[in-house]
A protein has these predicted regions:
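Exposed beta-strand/loop interface patches that mediate assembly or binding
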Residues: 1-119
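Intrinsic low-complexity, repeat-rich intrinsically disordered segments enriched
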Residues: 126-194
Length: 194
């Protein structure tokens, strides 16, 4: 085989290679990974593709063992970039329905949007979910929900089960109906006469 033919074959073979991640360097700028095709060959450090890298940016580092493809211009694998996310031994599909988007994580957490059911479910086995908009913040933990805001308006019937503590003034424009005792400064006010 001539040199030109051998080079041509090498370029074709290197253009797209099925491979998996064998190393990740998150401290590099930009972060990089090394991939292997399962033989003794291991790539140089290469960048990986993300969902978005412009004004909107997405971050997810590929996992060790994650399968994907190395795309190399002119078959030069040293110039390749890795496209992660090929289902296989390292990670089976998290779902198989055509009307959902699903993220599942190793700790048991998940993000599931089902546009047929019009449902978005965030599941954490433990920890914290925080939503911040300017100075307003909602924090959900294993055993509490904390809301911080300048004003909270509720336009609905509100049902509360359990004790209620109010640390501040209370202003009411309608009636107050109570089936139990009404205490004022430690004294029952139920039968107070004017």
């Amino acid at each position: 085989m001539s040199y030109a033919s051998a080079q041509h074959d090498r370029m074709i073979a290197g253009a797209v290679k099925a491979c998996y991640v064998v190393a990740v360097d998150l401290s590099a700028s930009p972060p990089v990974c090394r991939v292997s095709d399962g033989s003794e060959w291991v790539s140089a450090w290469v960048r990986w593709h993300s969902i978005a890298a412009g004004k909107a940016r997405h971050w997810r580092a590929p996992s060790l063992g994650e399968q994907g493809s190395l795309i190399s211009p002119s078959g030069d694998v040293s110039q390749g970039t890795f496209v992660p996310g090929l289902y296989g031994n390292a990670g089976p599909p998290p779902d198989n329905r055509d009307h959902v988007e699903v993220w599942r994580f190793d700790d048991g957490g998940s993000l599931v949007y089902d546009w047929q059911a019009k449902s978005y479910t965030i599941t954490l086995p433990s920890g914290t979910v925080a939503i911040k908009v300017g100075g307003t913040e909602v924090v959900v933990t294993d055993n509490a929900v904390t809301v911080k805001s300048g004003t909270i308006d509720l336009e609905a019937t509100v049902n509360i089960k359990g004790p209620v503590n109010i640390d501040g003034a209370l202003s009411v424009t309608g009636n107050i109906d109570g089936a139990g005792n009404i205490m004022a400064a430690g004294n029952s006010d139920n039968h107070h006469k004017h």
